[in-house]
From Swiss-Prot:
Mode of membrane association: Multi-pass membrane protein
Keyword Repressor: no
Top EC category: oxidoreductase
Annotated site residue numbers, Stabilizes free radical intermediate: 194
PROSITE patterns for this protein: REACTION_CENTER
Note describing how the cofactor binds: The D1/D2 heterodimer binds P680, chlorophylls that are the primary electron donor of PSII, and subsequent electron acceptors. It shares a non-heme iron and each subunit binds pheophytin, quinone, additional chlorophylls, carotenoids and lipids. D1 provides most of the ligands for the Mn4-Ca-O5 cluster of the oxygen-evolving complex (OEC). There is also a Cl(-1) ion associated with D1 and D2, which is required for oxygen evolution. The PSII complex binds additional chlorophylls, carotenoids and specific lipids.
Primary subcellular site in the record, as a coarse category: plastid
Modification after translation, per record: Tyr-165 forms a radical intermediate that is referred to as redox-active TyrZ, YZ or Y-Z.
Protein name per the record: Photosystem II protein D1
Organism: Heterocapsa rotundata
Length: 348
């Protein structure tokens, strides 16, 4: 009779080992939750971070316009923290997927800006895994799923400027550079080419970001100003607070009454749940609209155009603010990629 003792023990040992590993990955008691999405997130974010830092410091100049005039973005090539950036992939690459094995060598890959695609794609998928990990952790704790829904706003905004816009424009060289001055350059060129300031979805995004900041400051100041005193007058309010206590720490009715009389009654919330839903939804929806706007402008469905739209009874043009902005747009348009342009045909 065949002896199956050792085989059975091996299966049991393997099962025990993988059971331990899976239990560790999915444990909600760990100081840092990992989860199934964490298996994807941690290496992707780590690779993107290491590659970004290395490229920001050491990467050689990149032929961003595809005309053999490389642009330097690394610190070792004379840049500082403000002017430095990871330069987008070359216009010669277009929207082709450009991993290192597609180049003739590592030097060519660097020259054509392969690091930009490497950092961006690892970051996008890593951030997507982070969002999935937020849902997974909330699910295991029995929480509602709205945390990952809120995080979807910055994720879709990142996808819009790093992935959708380059695809719509036909080249990753049109993506947003990974640096401070590069970001501002991207914004100016975007305005010049798409008139984003006159796009309704951008206006909604501005309202979402600035409105969210205003509402957050208002909420924080109201809560801090209406804390319930559990101590004597000569002691700090913090002394009477215990972390995790079930009792309320501030009086929402007092805050509601104050703000309702400061503005008007219906400008204030008397329900904590509706208040915090509003605080979350306002900026998230605004940023969703901005991402949608950038994604539509990626395919040249641009902002509204009111240039030369006002004339007097004699048919003479009366310049408006739209015409002034248009003149600024023309100036920015001819200044960027100036060696790749054939002025003035580029403005036709």
């Amino acid at each position: 009779m065949k002896n199956t003792f050792n085989t059975s023990n091996a299966f049991a040992s393997a099962y025990s080992f993988w059971g331990y590993v899976i239990g560790f990955l999915l444990s909600t008691s760990n100081r840092l939750y990992i989860g199934w999405f964490g298996i994807l997130m941690f290496p992707l974010i780590s690779l993107a971070t290491v590659a970004y830092i290395a490229a920001f410091i050491f990467a050689p100049p990149v032929d961003i316009d595809g005309i053999r005039e490389p642009v330097a973005g690394a610190l070792l090539y004379g840049n500082n923290i403000i002017s430095g950036a990871v330069i987008p992939s070359s216009n010669a690459i277009g929207v082709h997927f450009y991993p290192v094995w597609e180049a003739l060598g590592f030097d060519e890959w660097l020259y054509n800006g392969g690091t930009y695609q490497f950092v961006v794609l690892h970051f996008i998928f890593g951030a997507g895994a982070w969002m999935g990990r937020e849902w997974e952790f909330a699910f295991r704790l029995g929480m509602r799923p709205w945390i990952f829904v809120a995080f979807s706003a910055p994720l879709v905004a990142s996808c819009a400027v790093f992935v959708v816009y380059p695809i719509g424009q036909g080249s990753f060289s049109d993506g947003m550079p990974l640096g401070i001055s590069g970001t501002f350059n991207f914004m100016l060129v975007f305005q010049a080419e798409h008139n984003i300031l006159m796009h309704p979805f951008h206006i909604l995004g501005v309202a979402g970001v600035f409105g969210g900041s205003l509402f957050s400051a208002m909420h924080g100041s109201l809560v801090t100003s209406s804390l319930l005193a559990e101590t004597a007058g000569d002691l700090s309010l913090n002394v009477g607070y215990n972390f995790g206590q079930e009792d309320e720490t501030y009086s929402i009715s007092a805050a509601h009454g104050y703000f309702g009389r400061l503005i008007f009654q219906y400008a204030s919330f008397n329900n904590s749940r509706s208040l915090h839903f509003f605080l979350a939804a306002w900026p998230v929806i605004g940023i969703w609209f901005t991402a949608l706007g950038v994604s539509t402008m990626a395919f040249n469905l641009n902002g509204l155009n009111f240039n030369q739209s006002i004339i007097d009874s004699s048919g003479h043009l009366i310049n408006s603010w739209a015409d002034i902005v248009n003149r600024a747009d023309l100036g920015m348009e001819v200044m960027h990629e100036r060696n790749a342009h054939n002025f003035p045909l580029d403005l036709a």
